[in-house]
From Swiss-Prot:
HAMAP family: QueG. The lineage of its organism: Bacteria, Pseudomonadati, Pseudomonadota, Gammaproteobacteria, Vibrionales. It is found in: Cytoplasm. It is an enzyme of class 1 (oxidoreductase). [4Fe-4S] cluster 2 binds at residues 199, 215, 242, 245. It comes from Vibrio cholerae serotype O1 (strain ATCC 39315 / El Tor Inaba N16961). PROSITE patterns: 4FE4S_FER_1, 4FE4S_FER_2. Belongs to the QueG family. This is Epoxyqueuosine reductase. Catalyzes the conversion of epoxyqueuosine (oQ) to queuosine (Q), which is a hypermodified base found in the wobble positions of tRNA(Asp), tRNA(Asn), tRNA(His) and tRNA(Tyr). [4Fe-4S] cluster 1 binds at residues 189, 192, 195, 249. One of its GO terms (cellular component) is cytoplasm.
Length: 369
């Protein structure tokens, strides 16, 4: 069999299935094992125990599917039209949701596309051992993507491509056929440190190393406990994930919009008013978030994140009333509500003093000099 011709055909099939780019690499990730172990030993994975539980299996694809010879790494863009980054982040009364989560959950969509790709290959070669992976499986997808030529690992630890930035999902198809491999990508970050200096919680502790325990994405999505005080103000209005390190990256000026309508903003998130989203009861949350990656954090965590955002919002009697009405429903939520109410109350002093000063000036001075 002409494996080079097959590799070319696989890449064409992938494009037809909706992927933007596909690359092929071998399964040797041994050079990444020391860094992975050091990251785990430092506790940077936080409470994501499954990462430590799988250990070095993440760097050994052949242990996930015995007989694996190659990894087909695929990329699909998710940047939605009218992303409204600046207008959303600059309005503290509106919730900011990481742009990857505005539409449908990508896991099923990308996995299904990879499965179809595997089926096409099997039809061509006969019996084929293959298995698709998307994000949640214990596999080092970013080193694989770099090795397959899809981009390099940026200082924020995400994969970057000079023509497409970083607004894309990755998926892998493990196969047991000896396809020719692609050239790995070379790092193009240079001396730029925009992502490191712009992280609101200083979570990027070294080039390419993120302490998840400090990362807003981890805190709002993976962590279900009490948010440490030191991070609450820095979270701002970010209630699900954070895009700051991508927003400041110069390479993302070239990022194209997604061709997948499933990744467009869902209608239920058109009104991102903090109070409106917080007032959703659990049934409404589950209904509005059906098919969304957001759904898996659950209603309580959704509200916890919104409480912090309301604490960070400008002084608002509406917010104070909303928070007070929901006291006593949960110890976890109460912990954050008390903090948010204190934050809101502190904000009333300065505006009131300012208003008093203005009244005195208006009444006491013959003119506004």
């Amino acid at each position: 069999m002409d494996y080079q011709q097959l590799a070319n055909q696989i890449k064409q099939w992938a494009i037809e299935l909706g992927f933007e780019k596909v690359g092929i690499c071998d399964v040797d990730l041994s050079e990444h094992e020391p860094a992975l172990q050091a990251w785990l030993d430092a506790g940077y994975h936080g409470e994501m125990d499954w990462m430590a539980r799988h250990g070095m299996m993440r760097a050994r694809p052949a242990e996930l599917l015995p007989g694996t010879l190659r990894v087909i790494s695929a990329r699909i863009n998710y940047l939605p039209p009218q992303a409204q980054f600046a207008s959303n982040l600059s309005d503290p009364n509106q919730a900011y949701i990481s742009r990857y989560a505005l539409g449908r959950d990508y896991h099923k969509l990308v996995r299904n596309q990879l499965k179809k790709l595997g089926e096409k290959i099997e039809q061509e070669v006969g019996k084929l051992g293959y298995r698709p992976f998307v994000d949640s499986a214990p596999i080092l997808e970013r080193p694989l993507a770099q090795k397959a030529g899809l981009g390099w690992t940026g200082k924020h630890s995400l994969i970057l491509d000079k023509e497409n930035g970083s607004w894309f999902f990755l998926g892998e198809l493990l196969v047991d056929i000896p396809l020719p491999v692609d050239e790995p990508s070379e790092n193009q970050c240079g001396k730029c440190t925009a992502c490191i200096t712009s992280c609101p919680t200083n979570a990027i502790v070294a080039e390419g190393v993120v302490d998840a325990r400090r990362c807003v994405s981890y805190l709002t999505i993976e962590y279900s406990g009490v948010i440490p005080l030191e991070f609450r103000r820095a979270m701002g209005n970010r209630i699900y994930g954070c895009d700051d390190c991508q927003l400041v990256c110069p390479w993302n000026r070239f990022a194209p919009l997604t061709q997948q309508s499933d990744f467009h903003r869902r209608q239920s998130l058109n009104n991102a008013d903090l109070v409106v989203l917080f007032e959703w009861d659990e049934a409404t949350f589950l209904k509005n978030m059906e098919g969304s990656a957001i759904r898996r954090i659950g209603h309580q965590q959704w509200r916890r994140n919104l409480i912090i955002a309301m604490g960070n919002a400008p002084y608002s009697p509406r917010i104070i009333d909303t928070l007070q009405r929901h006291l006593g429903q949960s110890e976890l939520l109460d912990e954050h509500i008390h903090w948010a109410l204190e934050e809101q109350t502190q904000k009333t002093a300065t505006p009131r003093q300012h208003a008093r000063l203005i009244r005195i000036i208006e009444k006491g001075l013959p003119r506004d000099a």
